[in-house]
């Protein structure tokens, strides 16, 4: 089945890193190839413009895709957002030149020219406000248009605000917040492949910021150690074959490890081993 991913832009690299982290690795190295087999034999990757991905998934010919929430809303496509992937975060904002003196969306004058590639979002947003504006459709480099006298304002994605600052622009309204989403066609929401992909992505995110800790504990110190050691439910405890010693292991938050290890050591734990977790699947 085909999974559409961004072929360019701010979502491309994070998407590839996420897929590799969950075990979906492209098997073809030719960057010109648009369809690539992967290490999951039931998934092929198709590369497409992020703004086109909602339409491709809506067509039913593509099982799933990764793209921005802003592109999904702009397209009006009949797709299901099954996961917020927590990268590519930004805000779709209306911004004006700092020199305009405009401080809020209410001060934007009637007939103002608003440049954007999010035409449908812009029309709907200003219609809901009851404001009459002229939408100037552009494909890119929208920030420069006010300087060129082609637009009075822009509607575009702001991640850090640096690009707006460079071009002398300031945001006056937030239209929506966006981030990368995993989308599927409605017919595939309950498909086993969708469930598998969602499980592995959630497992990868759940493992972030956690470590697995193993330790050996004499029987006389076991109660003291267990009273210190956090766990998702309860630490696992196994008696070793030799001696009156137990092996204990647990999943713990990474940020408490330095203090936790010293407390465990002082409580009588020894042979402490800390390892990374690739995925944590509940």
Swiss-Prot record:
Top-rank lineage group of the source organism: Archaea
Protein name: ATP phosphoribosyltransferase
EC number, UniProt record: 2.4.2.17
GO process annotations (BP): L-histidine biosynthetic process
Organism: Pyrobaculum islandicum (strain DSM 4184 / JCM 9189 / GEO3)
Record-stated family: Belongs to the ATP phosphoribosyltransferase family. Long subfamily.
Reaction(s) the record says it catalyses: 1-(5-phospho-beta-D-ribosyl)-ATP + diphosphate = 5-phospho-alpha-D-ribose 1-diphosphate + ATP
Cellular component terms (Gene Ontology): cytoplasm
A GO molecular function held by the record: ATP binding
Pfam families from the UniProt entry: HisG, HisG_C
Database matches in NCBIfam families: hisG (TIGR00070), HisG_C-term (TIGR03455)
Function: Catalyzes the condensation of ATP and 5-phosphoribose 1-diphosphate to form N'-(5'-phosphoribosyl)-ATP (PR-ATP). Has a crucial role in the pathway because the rate of histidine biosynthesis seems to be controlled primarily by regulation of HisG enzymatic activity.
Activity regulation, per record: Feedback inhibited by histidine.
Required cofactor names: Mg(2+)
Localization: Cytoplasm
Pathway: Amino-acid biosynthesis; L-histidine biosynthesis; L-histidine from 5-phospho-alpha-D-ribose 1-diphosphate: step 1/9
UniProt keyword annotations, A-Z: Amino-acid biosynthesis, ATP-binding, Cytoplasm, Glycosyltransferase, Histidine biosynthesis, Magnesium, Metal-binding, Nucleotide-binding, Transferase
Matching PANTHER family: ATP PHOSPHORIBOSYLTRANSFERASE, ATP PHOSPHORIBOSYLTRANSFERASE ATP-PRTASE
Enzymatic class: transferase
